[in-house]
């Protein structure tokens, strides 16, 4: 039996460990867009196949 707890397609336990590589701040998971959002850096890192791509060059800039 699989004990993995998931939010969308990312493991919640992994989400608790991840921080923004630029600011070292917390990340929020956006299930609709399948992204990890760093509000402090104003970047959204993509999650592809359940794997967070934590490269600033791959992140989408958040503009208001």
UniProtKB/Swiss-Prot annotation:
Give the CC-aspect GO terms.
Answer: cytosol
Short name of any one Pfam family annotated for the protein: Trm112p
Superkingdom to which the source organism belongs: Bacteria
Listed as disulfide-bonded, the cysteine pairs are none
InterPro entries, alphabetized: Trm112-like
Show the PANTHER family listed in the entry: PROTEIN PREY, MITOCHONDRIAL, ZGC:162634
Q: Which family does it belong to?
A: Belongs to the UPF0434 family.
Name of protein? UPF0434 protein BOV_A0835
Name the species this protein comes from.
Brucella ovis (strain ATCC 25840 / 63/290 / NCTC 10512)
């Amino acid at each position: 039996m699989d004990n993995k707890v998931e939010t969308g397609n990312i493991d919640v336990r992994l989400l608790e460990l991840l921080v923004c590589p630029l600011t070292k701040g917390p990340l929020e998971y956006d299930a609709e867009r399948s992204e990890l959002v760093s509000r402090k850096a104003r970047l959204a890192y993509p999650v592809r196949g359940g794997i967070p791509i934590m490269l600033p060059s791959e992140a989408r800039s958040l503009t208001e």
